[in-house]
């Protein structure tokens, strides 16, 4: 016989269903479940006296014959494509199904088979997202990677060689020897990693050897001389090898203005870092490149969102990161030219309009790599408070705004860097790089981080306790982060030229080399999901005011933010 229960009781037992709404942490962002792929009355749940037991929700099917390795039950998926309740199957480290799990011998509508060889992760009342992708990493110290992972980031792309002065300032790994050494070190870390080589050269030879040596991208940085000649040469070589180019333009306008840089692009696709300009770039109007079809614009997180403290902290950060001397007037003027409250305020709004497509950190080099996800949602919340609902949303929910913002650190950087077939979203056929969150801690502190189908990190209580929850609770690496499980569940992204050669053998690495692809003519700003707007942008050279299609973009700095001190008292 059937039994009718209230929505609140159902949500407590199996998680929210269609029409239920969930607040994201302490923000004003509300999501509403669009669809429930499970079957009422046939839900699967693990535990004593629950459904997933032999002959009930668990079948006799072997893994060889189709039972999943792992099932995440009754999770609320939040992704660019939807906000959907479902069971999620993982097999051989890959997401193989999103739908209804159970035992097809006794249950209807089952498309995910639970067998004796299936493990269960309880997703009831939890939010499931794709692992984050931080595409602006200064590899200054290896300890960064653990901090990023514990925040929900599972893929990192950038450059550097450790705490050298070149790495403090620029995301470039120079030359094939350094690239090789960095890739060899990557076997120690349970995340996907990629190296950007130095793109500043006026002739192709040095760039080609870095690409063939394992770089998956090239980075043009003003501290190495981002001249029109270097830009043109770098993009020409990148076109030949199908890799992405990232650019930090000329703050001092020594070799040209923003118009000269755009001319050097020649309409070719390029990823523009910290497009607002506080992180570097043509002062005061680099932000204008966000209006171009061929530019994939991103932000770094220290300016996200604009608060009453943003301006004050930036000057000191900049002096340290770019090896400047405050006693030299020219160095001080260089620093001050980059920090403009008007363009930082406009950056908030351009994110909300979908004109700035991606979010990243700029780790330890004017950015906090453990806060990419936090600051994305702080920006979304600030814009909800200041600008109200987006036209695509209703009074009931902020679903479209949430989809827009989550795309900024998941699918869009994956598209920009040619790896979206493998990572970047919760979709079948992709690597199971997943993060499970309690709604009250969404965006701040994950419940569980899954990498390539294995749990690699989670908050864990005293290992000597009788149960897993007693204090002190710390984020800790799990079994998936050790031994050969680590190298089997994560990859190194590289160029097609490097992957096709003998690089893995020559370097003696265990991780699989995965080539990037389709990052040149095949993509443009239109490829940036929910973030493809190209308004005409103008910057007043005297006041620094920014206008989009003639409308002044301005907003007040935030006095208080969500996802902040109340979550970090201990």
Curated annotation (Swiss-Prot):
Substrate binds at residue 221. Its cofactor is Ni cation. Residues 131-570 form the Urease domain. Ni(2+) 1 binds at residues 136, 138, 219, 362. One of its GO terms (molecular function) is urease activity. Pathway: Nitrogen metabolism; urea degradation; CO(2) and NH(3) from urea (urease route): step 1/1. Coiled coil: none annotated. Gene3D superfamilies: Metal-dependent hydrolases (3.20.20.140), Urease, subunit C, domain 1 (2.30.40.10). The keyword tRNA processing does not apply. GO terms for biological process: urea catabolic process. The modification N6-carboxylysine is found at residue 219. The keyword Hydrolase applies. It catalyses: urea + 2 H2O + H(+) = hydrogencarbonate + 2 NH4(+). It comes from the Bacteria. It is an enzyme of class 3 (hydrolase). Binds 2 nickel ions per subunit. Its EC number is 3.5.1.5. Keywords: Cytoplasm, Hydrolase, Metal-binding, Nickel. Heterotrimer of UreA (gamma), UreB (beta) and UreC (alpha) subunits. Three heterotrimers associate to form the active enzyme. NCBIfam families: PRK13206.1, PRK13207.1, urease_alph. PANTHER family: UREASE. Belongs to the metallo-dependent hydrolases superfamily. Urease alpha subunit family. This is Urease subunit alpha. It comes from Rhodopseudomonas palustris (strain ATCC BAA-98 / CGA009).
